Each structure stands twice: as structure tokens, then as C-alpha cells.
Amino acid sequence: ALLPTGPAIGAGTSAVSRFTTSGGVWVRPDNVQLAINATQFLATTPTLWDSSLSVTANGNYITTRTWAGAATLTTAGASTTTCNNWASAASTSYGWVGLPASSRKSTAFANYATMGGITQCDNTQHRVYCLQQ
């Protein structure tokens, strides 16, 4: 889970804090609607998005886990949920992951906390959610 320096969401920061709630429809790279606007996408309710976050920037569909870093979009990450602020690739550090194929926010964003190999920071199989407003 060692990530390059950049705009990643780290410890003490929620995903919501990086976006404004203005703007129109949010869509995936394949143009499928995620929510009618930023407010709906970023809010804790409703509990479902219109579609899942299961499409990569290249248009590939995925079902594997994705690094999330916190329990919800509105919850700030901690060093224990973000692989030490995404700076650790050690098997003794952990990060929270979600399931991008789910449109249920609680499952998509952080379905798993500390669960052995699934969330150990040396796991190179997980992708990272990337949102652009």
C-alpha cells in the first residue's frame, strides 16, 4: 500500500473533505451514473449509489478489493486504517479495504478492517479509488 506522494487521502482526512458538494451528475468512466450530484454521492444517506465504483479509468470492470482507508467517505482515516498514511508496505501495518462492485456505500468504501492478508499493507493486489470532480 505504499503510494507515491500526491493527493491521496491519508490519516486525519476524510474523502469528503477533498470535494465540494456543488456540481452535477457523477459518472464512472463508462458514463454510468453514480449519483445525481456530488451531494448525493458524498452524503451518508442515501445508503446506496446509483451504481458501483467497479470500473477502472481504462474502462475495465473489477470485483477485487480496493484500498479505502476509512469506514465511510465522511470518516477520517487513521494511521491504523491507511497503512500509516499510505507510507508503509509492511505486513505488520494495515489499511481498510472495500468492495468496488457494491453500490452499497458501507460495503464499497470499507467492508474489511484488520483481517490478516486481506488488509496487510504488503498486499499488492488491491487498487485505489480515484475520484475526480
List the model feature ranges, each with a label.
Residues A1-Q133:
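Secreted/extracellular ectodomain signature
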